Swiss-Prot record:
Gene Ontology cellular component annotations, sorted alphabetically: cytoplasm
Source species: Alteromonas mediterranea (strain DSM 17117 / CIP 110805 / LMG 28347 / Deep ecotype)
Region: Involved in Mg(2+) ion dislocation from EF-Tu, residue numbers: 79-82
One Pfam family it belongs to: EF_TS
Subcellular location: Cytoplasm
Name this polypeptide is given: Elongation factor Ts
Coiled coil spans: none
Lineage: Bacteria, Pseudomonadati, Pseudomonadota, Gammaproteobacteria, Alteromonadales
Keywords for the protein's UniProt record, in alphabetical order: Cytoplasm, Elongation factor, Protein biosynthesis
Length: 290
């Protein structure tokens, strides 16, 4: 029997597995969809695919700096318990090595990469079947630069900093600052015009409401805008390890400059599903009956 697009679509809908996995399963069974499902269930693919639909907003951030390149990976799971699991962390570190060795910046490319003689996606499916939770590599990045630093806080926040000049220790300190202070931009002059204009409108309205004369209000707004662009930018912020100096001063004192930074935080932007305890228990009991 010919393996049609409609057949692949039906198998995807029934198992939740990826298109290529579904096509492969159908080719192996000569288009017999029921046998394909049976084989996928035996191999754990269908089970893993069903779990892939569940929200994975916990996890870990991992980093590596070596040979002029810094790599950072976010690997998600469903619970903080699994985020500390030895097998989960081992898989994460293996993915980090694969991403670094192959300069991978795309999750699809990472899933298709080879790990221990299999595709990363296949190793992931096996781990999902073993652990019983959705596990998902979410994002990965490789950057190159003159001086690179990486810092991970509690496994949940990771930062790569890219400097010119200075050394790795300085770059790590800058990365630590970014993890703690979460600046939105690198330098005050990097703050987009639309962001500046929006804040300026707010500050003008505040000044007008305060009843200040126009010339005083204008000076107030100018001062507040300078403070605002400093607060939201890395170099304008007080250095977390020594608030008596700014990050800009720290860099200048070490004959260095910051080019950019990348900050990952576990689960940011993922809408978490909330359930009350009774509903969660009821759902688990219902699942146990199946």
């Amino acid at each position: 029997m010919a393996v049609t697009a409609a057949l692949v679509k039906e198998l995807r809908e029934r198992t939740g597995a990826g298109m290529l996995d579904c096509k492969k399963a159908l080719v192996e069974t000569d288009g017999d969809i029921e046998l394909a499902i049976e084989n996928m269930r035996k191999s754990g693919q269908a089970k893993a695919a069903k779990k892939a639909g569940r929200i994975a907003a916990e996890g870990v951030i991992l980093t590596k700096v070596e040979g002029g390149r810094a790599t950072m990976l976010e690997l998600n799971c469903e619970t903080d318990f699994v985020a500390r699991d030895e097998g989960f962390l081992k898989f994460g570190n293996e993915l980090l090595e694969v991403a670094a060795a192959n300069n991978i910046n795309d999750i699809d490319a990472l899933n298709d990469a080879e790990l221990n003689g299999s595709k990363v996606s296949e190793v992931r499916d096996a781990l999902v079947a073993k652990i019983g939770e959705n596990i998902s590599p979410r994002r990965v990045i490789n950057v190159e630069g003159d001086t690179l630093g990486a810092y991970v806080h509690g496994g949940r926040i990771g930062v790569i900093s890219i400097l010119t000049g200075g050394d790795e220790e300085l770059a790590k300190d800058v990365a630590m600052h970014v993890a703690a202070a979460s600046p939105q931009f690198v330098k005050p002059e990097n703050v987009p015009a639309e962001v500046v204009e929006k804040e300026k409108e707010i500050q003008i309205e505040i000044a007008i409401q305060s009843g200040k004369p126009a010339e005083i209000a204008e000076k107030m707004v100018a001062g507040r805008m300078k403070k605002f662009t400093g607060e939201v930018s890395l170099t304008g912020q007080p250095f977390v390890k020594d608030p008596s100096i700014s990050v800009a001063e720290l860099l200048k004192n070490n004959s260095a400059d910051v080019i950019n930074f990348v900050r990952f935080e576990v689960g940011e932007g993922i809408e978490k599903k909330t359930e009350d305890f009774a509903a969660e228990v009821a759902a688990q009991m219902e699942a146990a009956k199946k």
